[in-house]
Amino acid sequence: MSFVTEIKTFAALGSGVIGSGWIARALAHGLDVVAWDPAPGAEAALRARVANAWPALRKQGLAPGAAQERLRFVASIEECVGDADFIQESAPERLDLKLDLHARISAAARPDVLIGSSTSGLLPSEFYAEASHPERCLVGHPFNPVYLLPLVEVVGGERTAAEAVRAAMRVYESLGMRPLHVRKEVPGFIADRLLEALWREALHLVNDGVATTGEIDDAIRFGAGLRWSFMGTFLTYTLAGGNAGMRHFMAQFGPALQLPWTYLPAPELTEALIDRVVEGTAEQQGARSIAELERYRDDCLLAVLGAIRETKARHGFAFAE
């Protein structure tokens, strides 16, 4: 079966931080967007988020015809998805909610239209169990801010067609993203599993009084974080092995993985630990508002992405390599 990959109308269900990021990205790529969210005040909040993201998108470069005015907010699921060429759901992470939602979405959508979910914690075989034409249903898990970060993890369920996964990856690429096919259904997929391991270690370091939240963030942003933005973990460690490469690195440093100085279980989230984390991050934030920090983050991301793209091209690499 073939699926629609030429997208003119993008349907978005859920308009919170993630959903609005999808909407802003689709608008910036010159698409018409139809959005639905049953929460009170959702439309006004959505339009404000899109407006806040637009300066960064303008700096990155808008597609011909891209305009915030091409967003239409509707009152029903059926009106949202009925004429859509691609559907992205970004609803709260509740299995019962997603089961019902996708039964309704899939019943109202054309059978050759792909349906993606932004879920980070649920598996597609579970929440697409009652969907019509489940062969076109999958996960497209993005990262915040969705309108700037290119990574999207694409995960198929037990009944997802292989062609649907390939088609979805083409659609996401057309939106300027770097789709990553997750080969097996596994909780947390790829990136969040890595991030959760780091998060657990960070909480232990705060809980044990080893470092403040600011010091831990400094350890990442002035160290490994800079390398990760263009090289990743495995290639970084390959270089650490010198001319002998990864095999030498594994032989030299592999035994250290058995040392008992790292934690795998998360620390107990006591009130004292929560207070310490909240107080530390409040000190880091200072007097800056969340909106100010979002604009700062967006400008930094644009600068980093631009520098990486330019440097890779100079060395003969494509951006996705």
From Swiss-Prot:
Keywords: Cytoplasm, NAD, Oxidoreductase. Its main location: cytoplasm. GO terms for molecular function: carnitine 3-dehydrogenase activity; NAD+ binding; oxidoreductase activity. It comes from the Bacteria. It catalyses: carnitine + NAD(+) = 3-dehydrocarnitine + NADH + H(+). It is an enzyme of class 1 (oxidoreductase). One of its GO terms (cellular component) is cytoplasm. Transmembrane segments: none annotated. Optimum pH is 9-9.5 for the forward reaction (oxidation) and 7.0 for the reverse reaction (reduction). Pathway: Amine and polyamine metabolism; carnitine metabolism. Induction: Highly induced by carnitine via the CdhR transcriptional regulator. Not induced by glycine betaine or pyruvate. It is found in: Cytoplasm. Disruption phenotype: Cells are incapable of growth on carnitine. The keyword Magnesium does not apply. InterPro entries: 3-OHacyl-CoA_DH (IPR022694), 3-OHacyl-CoA_DH_NAD-bd (IPR006176), 3HC_DH_C (IPR006108), 6-PGluconate_DH-like_C_sf (IPR008927), 6PGD_dom2 (IPR013328), L-carnitine_dehydrogenase (IPR026578), NAD(P)-bd_dom_sf (IPR036291). Its EC number is 1.1.1.108. SUPFAM superfamilies: 6-phosphogluconate dehydrogenase C-terminal domain-like, NAD(P)-binding Rossmann-fold domains. Belongs to the 3-hydroxyacyl-CoA dehydrogenase family. L-carnitine dehydrogenase subfamily. Homodimer. This is L-carnitine dehydrogenase. It comes from Pseudomonas aeruginosa (strain ATCC 15692 / DSM 22644 / CIP 104116 / JCM 14847 / LMG 12228 / 1C / PRS 101 / PAO1). The gene is cdhA.
